[in-house]
Curated annotation (Swiss-Prot):
Subcellular location: Secreted, Cell wall
Native source species: Staphylococcus aureus (strain COL)
UniProt domain NEAT: residue ranges: 29-150
Induction data: Repressed by fur in the presence of iron.
Compositionally biased tracts (Low complexity): 161-175
Taxonomic classification: Bacteria, Bacillati, Bacillota, Bacilli, Bacillales
Stated name of the protein: Iron-regulated surface determinant protein C
Length: 227
């Protein structure tokens, strides 16, 4: 009887270790960091807004969908953001650093993705009064992994992009020249593969079946010893 209990306990411990190992491996494969740049819309030219985005970003896969978590500085200047039509989901703020981290659903982690940014400034900049109110399209260039697939599609982005080189109230140009072009949500090779790997569900089911079988075996042996 003692030997049977030892085998039973060892088996349970082994199952726990196996499940934990596979779960950790799956989670590790579906999250990480990615470098990126912010371009002027539909170009390869770096946007002036690029300086307001901290690098790298973080990506995570949840329920078969891909998300990126992006941190911006000068947070109070950036009044709104969206990527592929998906509005930001603010997950953290740091008032002291004037930063916030927002999460966006995306279709891929590598390549160009369209976005939109709203900027409002009404304060002194470099010692001079400055007022700037602008909404414009931008393009993100993600340099993340190509082997992490998502099942999501782009949302409906706002088609009304703002004009290019604007001026503040003091007549100083912002140095930003964004394209005045409608956003057609051109997504390169959208990923449509399923989400969570099948083995994540198979392992617990198989483990439960094995546990039941071992339990029944132990009970049967115990009855045999008593009789």
């Amino acid at each position: 009887m003692k030997n049977i209990l030892k085998v039973f306990n060892t088996t349970i411990l082994a199952l726990i270790i196996i499940i934990a190992t596979f779960s950790n491996s799956a989670n590790a494969a579906d999250s990480g960091t990615l470098n990126y740049e912010v371009y002027k819309y539909n170009t390869n030219d770096t946007s002036i807004a690029n300086d307001y985005f901290n690098k790298p970003a973080k990506y995570i896969k949840k329920n078969g969908k891909l998300y990126v978590q992006i941190t911006v500085n000068h947070s109070h200047w950036i009044t709104g953001m969206s990527i592929e039509g998906h509005k930001e989901n603010i997950i953290s703020k740091n008032t002291a650093k004037d930063e916030r981290t927002s999460e966006f659903e995306v279709s891929k982690l590598n390549g160009k993705i369209d976005g939109k940014i709203d900027v409002y400034i009404d304060e002194k900049v470099n010692g001079k009064p400055f007022k700037y109110d602008h909404h414009y399209n931008i393009t993100y260039k993600f340099n993340g992994p190509t082997d992490v697939a998502g099942a999501n599609a782009p949302g409906k982005d706002d088609k009304n992009s703002a004009s290019g080189s604007d001026k503040g109230s003091d007549g100083t140009t912002t140095g930003q020249s964004e394209s005045n072009s409608s956003n057609k949500d051109k997504v390169e090779n959208p990923q449509t593969n399923a989400g969570t790997p099948a083995y994540i569900y198979t392992i617990p089911v198989a483990s439960l079946a094995l546990l039941i079988a071992i339990t029944l075996f132990v009970r049967k042996k115990s009855k045999g010893n008593v009789e």
